[in-house]
Amino acid sequence: MHIRGTMSRVPTLASFEVRYKKSFGHKFRDFIALCGHYCSPIKKYIFPNFIAVHYFYTIVLTLITSILLYPVKNIRYIDALFLAAGAVTQGGLNTVDVNNLTLYQQIILYIICCISTPIAVHSCLAFVRLYWFERYFDGIRDSSRLNFKMRRTKTILERELTARTMTKSKTGGTQRVSRPGKSDKRDDFQEKLFNGEMVNRDEQDSVHSSHNSRDSNSNANTNSSNNNSINHNGSSGSLDDYVREDKADEVEKYHGNKSYSSVGSSSNTATDENISQKLKPSSLRFDESQNKRKRTGAPSEKFAKRRGSRDITPEDMYRSIMMLQGEHEGTAEDEGPPLVIGSPTDGTRNMDNGSESKSAPTMNESKIRIQDKGAKISLDQDSVLHSSNSSACTSDEDSLPTNFGGTTPSLSAKPRESSSGPIAFTEGENADRKQGPSIQFNITKPPRKASKSKRVSTMDDLNPRSIFPHQKKSSKGYIMKHLPKARRIRQQIKRRLSTGSIDKNSSSDALDRGLISGLNDDDDGNEGDNMEEYFADNESGDEDDRMQQSEPQSGSELKLKQQQQHQLQQNLHRMYKTKSFDDNRSKPVLMERSKTIDMAEARDLNELARTPDFQKMVYKNWKAHHRNKPNFKRRGWNGKMFEHGPYTSDSDHNYQDNGNNSNSIVHYAESILHRDNSHRNGSEDVSSDSNETTYPLNGNNDHSQNDANGYPTYNDEEEGYYGLHFDSDYNLDPHHALSSNASKNYLSWQPTIGRNSNFLGLTRAQKDELGGVEYRAIKLLCTILVVYYVGWHIVSFVMLVPWINLKKHYSDIVRSDGVSPTWWGFWTAMSAFNDLGLTLTPDSMMSFDKAVYPLIVMIWFIIIGNTGFPILLRCIIWIMFKLSPDLSQMRESLGFLLDHPRRCFTLLFPKAATWWLLLTLVGLNFTDWILFIILDFGSTVVKSLSKGYRVLVGLFQSVSTRTAGFSVVDLSQLHPSIQVSYMLMMYVSVLPLAISIRRTNVYEEQSLGLYGEMGGKPEDTDTEEDGDCDDEDDDNEEEESHEGGSSQRGKSKKETKKKKKRKENENPNEESTKSFIGAHLRRQLSFDLWFLFLGLFIICICERDKIKDIQRPNFNVFTILFEIVSAYGTVGLSLGYPNTNQSFSRQLTTLSKLIIIAMLIRGKNRGLPYSLDRAIILPSDRLEHIDHIEDLKLKRQARTDTDDPMTEHLKRSISDAKHRWDELKHKRSLSRSSKRSTKTN
């Protein structure tokens, strides 16, 4: 074939360009990025963190609002600035009556208040982080969607497999049990290698079994047929005997000598031990002759005599090294089966039986010879080892294996035949090998899964002389275990997956059912076992092979068997030609799954789950079977809610599929994975690890529940949106967290989570995936926040506007103040929900002290608009999580928000912190309410109201005192102690929310300046000082006790203090919750107190004349302090001044008003998080640096505690209190007993 010397570069297809049109959002993001680029110096030095930005936003918005209010010229500018500051900060203090403002000014205050509330500000921060995610992570929207589809596909597959495995484990127990006394393979190999007993690592299990069974060889063959015939029925009582007899036959075939047969029925060999370890595909072996093996009476490679470990020649060491290299050497995918070169004397190996050698059967016929019972079998080692799973190999790509007979077929290629011809099977136990050294293909055996098929026992099964049923079952089992597993089939299957050309029509189903009907023509009472044998690669075929060997066969039986095999070959050929590998059988069988995760299978599942067509197929199939079906939930093995599988009893394996395609996807994926594993793993047996311990997945024996169509249902809980996933780097530990809560469904890997949702030790790929999940969670959260904020505004005025228009008495009061009732409803609803505290009526809410409905409605909106917002937000997300569709993208994002809220939003807390916040709010409001009822229930200010109204007024005032600032009674007329309590409540109003924000910070320890191993370092010095003082006190008390003669009392005190010290020193590395809460409180006090007293000091200087004026007794220092605390707490409550409707601030000078404005702005920033908070840091290199520091810090710690510290501290306190109470009771009992004894004496 001539090749041109030059090549043309002219393209065959004309290139064309499609210009990308940017959307409005993309252009807007580009504009923001351009502005940020030019303003980067300002952003870096003037706005280094969120707190600085918040200060700038508050001050600028206050100035803009004042500028918008002043042009009307009906108020002074200082009053406009004061009103603007009150609206921006929700302070609620007014120096003018709001009803005297124009509608324009009222609308400005309305809008400014709505865009400056804490909910609005933090929601804007969430939108900024969402934008920054899209700019920082390239293509995060598409990658997060693809990762979600991959996780969903893997979850569906693993749920199916796990449900079936759990069902089988409940009915049949564990699959593999590790027996005590088993030695490690590596240690056993090294010991026998240097003792001179064995060199080949692959033979260690068989030799180990043979050494343990030398004394029971005489009973092995006699017990074989009986045990096989009994265990063939699946009897649990004789299952171990059957497995041991199976191993005995394999070892006998392996060594070709009865003296090396395996243990009999009385052996204690473990049921899960594989006797014959298969040779590696890369190994090259020379077989020894049969006569030499009989003379030596030892395995193929063994030293002539036992010798010490020091008598090792270089040849022995070289051979051992080569063997170790072969042990770990992998096989490439394109490599074929390895060659096994037998010795020239193997041709005379089988001459003892006196039978003639038979020629290999052709492709259209099969000759089978069954050896007489008790006859000696001596075949090639690899042909025996891999006889049960040998696959046919032909040169034609479309050809199929057409010969399926005999118990131990060995695939051999004759030297004199052409390499292009087909390679025939050598049947019978006496193959002619006189031509010389034979070259054999070592067909690797796929992993063998233990099978526990349960069938109804019949007399035919129990009769060892019933030959024909076993022959039929053996042929079918042998056929199903020899389906084509070549590389070209895998490639065709993968090509079908990638192109989405999977045949799901009824024709393929009919063809598949036709095939299975052909397989089940001769029923022997175990329908569906063939499918299980094919997919699970169980050991039932070996059992049938032995049963075939136990009885002779006549010519008619052989002829009938050949006809059956020919018919099966045609069915298989049709199935292979149509590429119908779906498992849509009429009677699918529950496959037995291993409790361990194969790493190679996990990698295949990861690749398969990323295929788009396979994802669509799996999800469409799953969705079709979960539409409009009830969920039956039940407590499972780990205490969690999980859904049981579709199998309700042991005998219900052959359930009716009703034409559904529910399990076909799982069978399809399993069949691909099993075929891939058979070639990838070579001769490695996954279940052959003798030291592997399998734990039962379910301790109870409750029958599972299923839906109407027999399909398993699932439902996830809030605290565990769980699912089982494959991870190539994941090692299943028996004591791993998977036993109690599985890997999170929003991640494809098992995360290591530290304190406050801090993910540790992430790789770049894991960070990208976690960033995608966090991005989608923030995106959903932004939608929820907008609906929450706008929706509750709408609900609030919808509830108040109709009421004020229907109540003529109250509408007349509003009209008398010059305000429309409808506008009053809108304004009051906004003021209550945003905690502004300003009303359009000059006396606040005093005119509505008997209006029950608006007071109750306003109580609700005051709470959910400020301190109760995090509680209600988490409740809404939890309800949405419960109602969201299973395996949906929304459910995944909601689950992430519930598990890791502080990574996404500053005002969304974990479950424990939310409960603590709720208890704190209820406790504070209840305390104020009780104090009002106790101290002012009979005062003159509420004497005109009935008792019921007094209780309601007290409740409304206690709720408004902490946040809103509405007044339903004249506060100056209340009891002085109530005024003091209200002032304290105004100061601590924001503390529960602020402490919750800061103690749930992901970087809480770094924000407090703690970089060591102990979290309680701020109080370590105090502890040491206290300890020194205790030592001094102990010494002094001891001296006094000796001087005063009361040494016993001093010793008891000393012992109790030593016990306290011992308790403190028991857990030196334990994080101190009190130190964290104390550090937060100390920081807050250091932030607040000096500024409060500085403002009070300046105002007292400015108002000294008014304070000293005797004619103005209400102008005093306490009233000024009450006003300052109200402004600093952004509450808006005021004691007022006699004969005025405005706040007390109206009586202050201009400079004092500026101090109050500064208090409002400073107090607005009290509830903000620290500058080092993950929820306010944008994705950048700085964030990665902080994460790196956190990883290094947590790696030095002995453990990471993910429990809520406040809850743990409360539990420890309660346990300590109980312990002290028990000690006190014990001491009292001892003292009483001593007194009684003294009285009796």
Curated annotation (Swiss-Prot):
GO terms for cellular component: plasma membrane. Glycans are attached at residues 100, 223, 227, 233, 257, 274, 353, 364, 389, 442, 505, 538, 584, 660, 681, 691, 741, 925, 1141. Residues 164-177, 268-280, 345-365, 380-411, 498-509, 684-708 have a biased composition (Polar residues). Residues 520-545, 1021-1041 have a biased composition (Acidic residues). The chain crosses the membrane at residues 49-70, 78-98, 107-127, 784-806, 819-840, 844-864, 868-888, 904-924, 929-949, 977-997, 1084-1104, 1117-1137. Residues 215-238, 561-570 have a biased composition (Low complexity). It is a multi-pass membrane protein. Residues 162-241, 253-316, 329-570, 677-714, 1011-1073, 1222-1241 are annotated as: Disordered. Signal peptide: none annotated. InterPro entries: Cat_transpt (IPR003445), K/Na_transp_Trk1/HKT1 (IPR004773), Trk1_fungi (IPR015958), TrkH_K-transport (IPR051143). Residues 446-455, 482-497, 1050-1062, 1226-1241 have a biased composition (Basic residues). GO terms for biological process: intracellular potassium ion homeostasis; potassium ion import across plasma membrane. Keywords: Glycoprotein, Ion transport, Membrane, Potassium, Potassium transport, Transmembrane, Transmembrane helix, Transport. It is found in: Membrane. It holds the Pfam family TrkH. Residues 181-191, 199-214, 366-375 have a biased composition (Basic and acidic residues). GO terms for molecular function: high-affinity potassium ion transmembrane transporter activity. This protein is required for high-affinity potassium transport. Belongs to the TrkH potassium transport family. This is High-affinity potassium transport protein. It comes from Saccharomyces uvarum.
